[in-house]
């Protein structure tokens, strides 16, 4: 389903390639954890002034590699991105806990934004906020509310209309499409990606953002595809190497809806190829992308 096209032009600069971080005080190569907040900020170095590298959503299982000064933790997301988080942003777990979590009935937030409450009523106190794509464990149903367990073990209540059982949701997104799948399944998957992308229109640009709260260009593509059951790598230059290339040398006729369209500089004898921006193709010469905010523009 993933395809790539390179279009020459100018766009917001793509996130820089990760650079080595300072030597941590304590290695912890076998650690595991869950992202504990609705969206956790992952920084390139262990301090608040460091560049924001990416984000991870609540319930994301991560590897723990190192600790620095007892306050910052170096983690790795399932797509392989390594960066630093405040220790309060994650919950340490062991392999047994991770296995139990995988086997449990889980719920995914399917509303743009919600709140987890300490009682099943609208005027209850907030325990945490939640965003589209957050994953929690199912405990039970209480009227118009669903009781869930957050990654830190706290029980909370969320409007049932704001969550969906994870497995049925993944199945509904046509996440795995065999090579011999009917064309109708492929078209349905493309349509779901476009529907998801359009719901982000107006969401502000946020460097390194990967949630409905704010996205950068590659974070937008990554999040839209994630919300349809696909895992992309983090940066546009990495995404460009995913999937199959599409020839646009003679126009846009080979592009299909939901293809990724990349902007940048072709390689020359003096300079290497450089990817600076990514968008999702809507069809009819239009793209949707994050530039100042998520918007629709024409390439024609």
Where are these regions (language model features)?
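Second-shell loop/turn segments in exported
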Residues: 123, 178-184, 204-212, 268
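Boundary regions of SH3-family modules and the immediately adjacent low-complexity/disordered segments
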Residues: 13-30, 47, 61-63, 76-114, ...
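Active-site nucleophilic cysteine motif
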Residues: 197, 209-228
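Short alpha-helix capping/helix-loop boundary micro-motifs
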Residues: 46-51, 115-125, 241-251
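C-terminal motif of bacterial Sec signal peptides marking the signal peptidase cleavage site
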Residues: 6-9
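Loop/turn positions that initiate beta-strands
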Residues: 59, 130-136, 258
